[in-house]
Amino acid sequence: MGQVMKNSCWEDTAFWKNIEPDPQPMAARRVGGGHDGSSEFAGPVRREPLVLAVEDQIRFSPGVQTICEFLGIELEQVTSHRDLAPLLKAQRPMAVFCELDSPGQDGCHVMKIVAEHDRTLPVLVLTGDDPSLLGAAQAMEEILRLTGVVACRRLPAIGELVEFLFSAGRKGRCLSLMPG
């Protein structure tokens, strides 16, 4: 079972006491890479400090919500049956979280919709313990020429999740996440 650092602000959060952190560092989990970073948009896109969590069963959004609130980021949970394309266009999120193997709109479909919207949008894909799903995430990233996909077996440790969110905020020019 994962341990929370002593004297951290997460120490008393019951949710985190039941989360086992992924032992592989996030940097090593970066899927694919080496793409040219091209996007259908000219110049960097200004995004909102908003994360879309595509999930049908509330599995990872409660833990992410705690961190997002602490960082001043809005988290919106959307079901996998909702049309994601208009939502991406209207709300301009700084990142999308999804599960690769969900019952409705699986992670591969979410990645396809993200690629049609903005190939540079950071996507955190949870693959579970099935190694073939990691391979599927790598293949989809390569085929769709996505540049911001990070695949994890389960929700990353707190520090890595904060790092992912700050990186997404910088890329999306979310000024509320930038230091003073």
Q: Model-predicted segments: where are they?
A:
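As written
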Residues: 107, 138-150
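CheY-like receiver
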Residues: 87-90, 113, 164
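Conserved phosphotransfer microenvironments
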Residues: 97-120, 127-136
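His-Asp phosphorelay/catalytic-motif detector in bacterial-type signaling
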Residues: 92, 117-124, 147-148
